[in-house]
Design a protein with these regions (language model features):
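PP2C/PPM-type serine/threonine phosphatase catalytic domain
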Residues: 1-241
Length: 241
């Protein structure tokens, strides 16, 4: 199911899609907010913890609150999402990745849990985030990892504290930014992610192909992807001519 939100903002275009897959509930959510006049934008992908309506409500509330936050620091967007869930005690919990416009061509990214951000640019795919999972915690300390640890998150929106929120920055002059849930990145190998992002003509094509590929490869989770394309000024001007 596409969210049907491809739209231009200067040289920026984006789209998102999400599919329930074999789960009973689609507990993933996406959100985007753009301000062409100010050159500001924010995008979020959330994954509810669990397969139930409470998890779905948490993901939706968190994603919406994150992109509505006015802070340029994406950690502020995560904390705004935390406050939104605190106001809804009967709602569940979720993990979240947020990307916001920074100074010049910077893209500021923050996350809790195992939603990811990738950048496809100059013929290469870079994973920008590091999963907050028990498996990563053990691997970074050279401790043995047991099956299932990749699916146990160590941070979430409800437990978010400034010091625990992941943060990174990347220059986005041209390229393709991907935000996705683990239903995509834990199912598709990096080579498959790269090939889809490379060949897709538009963000709408990219997200549809990513989610479809995840389920065709036997993914057992909700699958959600949001793609943002940034093109150079001269390319945008040429296409508008």
């Amino acid at each position: 199911m596409s969210t049907d939100n491809t739209m231009p903002i200067g040289q920026l275009r984006w789209d998102a899609t999400s599919a329930r897959g074999p789960r009973a509930t689609n507990a993933d959510a996406t959100a985007g907010r753009t301000d062409p006049a100010a050159g500001r934008w924010a995008f979020a992908v959330a994954d509810g913890v669990g397969d139930n309506p409470a998890a779905a409500h948490a993901a939706r509330a968190a994603a919406d609150a994150a992109v509505a936050a006015t802070a340029a620091d994406p950690r502020g967007a995560i904390l705004a999402a935390r406050e939104a869930l605190a106001d809804q005690p009967d709602t569940g919990d979720c993990v979240l990745v947020v990307a916001v416009a920074g100074a010049e061509h910077a893209c500021e990214i923050a996350w809790v849990g195992d939603c990811r951000a990738y950048l496809w640019a100059d013929g290469a795919l870079r994973q920008l985030t590091e999963d907050h999972t028990l498996a990563v915690y053990f691997r970074t300390r050279n401790l043995p990892v047991t099956p299932g640890m990749d699916h146990v998150v160590t941070t979430s929106v409800r437990t978010a504290e400034p010091a625990l929120i992941g943060r990174t920055q990347v220059t986005l002059r041209t390229g393709r930014l991907l935000l996705c849930t683990d239903g995509v990145h834990k199912t598709l190998p990096a080579a498959r992610l790269r090939s889809i992002l490379e060949r897709a003509a538009t963000p709408a094509d990219a997200v549809a192909d990513l989610v479809d590929a995840a389920h065709r490869l036997g993914g057992q989770d909700n699958a959600t992807a949001l793609v943002v394309d940034r093109t150079a000024d001269h390319a945008a001007n040429s296409s508008a001519a």
